[in-house]
C-alpha cells in the first residue's frame, strides 16, 4: 500500500478444483481457500481490492457456492469463474455473484466477445491480445465493450511484447 499498490489478484481455489475437476469443493477445501482472504482483510481491511482468479476450472454449482462464501470479503471481481463453454451458466453465476464477472481471456474473437456481451454477464471485459486475434482485434473488442459501457482489463501472462501492446491498447481505449 505504501508503494501505491491498491489491488491484487489471487487464485486460492485452484488446488481444490484440481481434486474434483471443478465438480465439487469440500468444506475443508473451501475453508482453506478462504484463509488468504481472511488474512488480507485482517491485515489491511478494505484498503486493497482483491480480485479472484478461477482459471475457468469450476462447474456452475460449486462456483456459486464459492461466490457465496466470498461475499463477506467484498472481492473486486471474479475472473473466469466457470468454463466459458456455457454463456447461460455464466449469466446464472453473474446473477448470484456478489462481485462483477471479469471474462474472458480465453475468448478468441470479437464474435465470441459479442456473444458474451449480449448475455449481460460480464462486468469487466478481459481480453488477451495474444489470444483474441492481435491488437487490431483487441481494439474492436474494446470498442464493443465501450458500447456496453463496460471497462476493459487486458490480460497478459506471456511477456513484454503483449504487455507493451496491452499498454498501447489501454492508452487508446477510453474504457
Residues of each region from the PLM?
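Shared catalytic-loop signature of beta/alpha-barrel
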Residues: 68, 74-77, 85-175
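Metal-dependent enolase-superfamily TIM-barrel catalytic cores that perform enediolate-based chemistry
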Residues: 1-97
Amino acid at each position: 500500500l505504501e508503494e501505491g499498490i491498491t489491488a491484487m489478484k489471487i487464485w486460492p481455489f485452484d488446488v481444490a478444483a484440481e481434486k474434483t475437476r471443478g465438480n465439487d469443493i469440500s468444506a475443508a477445501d473451501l475453508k482453506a481457500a478462504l484463509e488468504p482472504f481472511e488474512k488480507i482483510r485482517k491485515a489491511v481491511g478494505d484498503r486493497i481490492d482483491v480480485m479472484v482468479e478461477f482459471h475457468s476450472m469450476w462447474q456452475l454449482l460449486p462456483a456459486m457456492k464459492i461466490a457465496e462464501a466470498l461475499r463477506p470479503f467484498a472481492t473486486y471481481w471474479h475472473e473466469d469463474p466457470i468454463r466459458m463453454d456455457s454463456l447461460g451458466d455464466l449469466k446464472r453465476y453473474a446473477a448470484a455473484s456478489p462481485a462483477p464477472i471479469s471474462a474472458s481471456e480465453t475468448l478468441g474473437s470479437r464474435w465470441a466477445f459479442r456473444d458474451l456481451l449480449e448475455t449481460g454477464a460480464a462486468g469487466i471485459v478481459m481480453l488477451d491480445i495474444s489470444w483474441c486475434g492481435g491488437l487490431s482485434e483487441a481494439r474492436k473488442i474494446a470498442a464493443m465493450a465501450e458500447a456496453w459501457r463496460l471497462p476493459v482489463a487486458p490480460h497478459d501472462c506471456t511477456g513484454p511484447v503483449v504487455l507493451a501492446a496491452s499498454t498501447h491498447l489501454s492508452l487508446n481505449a477510453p474504457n
